[in-house]
């Protein structure tokens, strides 16, 4: 009896150790450096760099909307790709001026950095990933305000690395799918343009309800006060349409970008 128990215990320890050696997580920050090294050697040579932003989203949605959304969508995208890992979210982005406060900086809790600081963070991060052995560094930006910065950094690095076989990509299709395409999809289902909105309205809020409803205050859904659109008819079923659209479009675009190199 004792021998059987010891055997079962040994099997349990062996199984646990095997799981530790082969983690299922795609998030870089959840891996040890040796696990990361081995995953890159095994073929996971694409790193997704999710870029969010910390800003007001009306009285009904948390300041971390962009960060949470791009974090979870990047995981889905990485798992579909199969050869990708996900870097920590870049949460500090250009959001407007401070003195005087402009754009979202007029609301408490929004955090901004200058464009040059933001670009240096992207560039330094990408150089770190190249050093770690990644061959394709993919920027996914969840916010519209820095798309040009993101594209500029990727273009400069890709030109510099032309002879190395390492490439930087700014996947603008991710943002287009989450904004213009998703809005058109909702409008095709009978929702008005003013209701769908461009910031924290029906589209934005429905996406968050599908991704992480904890960040939405259901008793505060209302237009105005930092909201562009009307979130009152938001629901996770509509949001899931957006999630599926974003993941599909982004995966297809990344595959094409990598194949072209």
PLM feature spans:
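N-terminal secretory signal peptides that target proteins for export/translocation
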Residues: 1-2
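Extended, histidine- and acidic-residue-enriched regions that form the cofactor-binding/catalytic faces
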Residues: 20-138, 142-261
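Bacterial N-terminal signal peptides
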Residues: 5-15
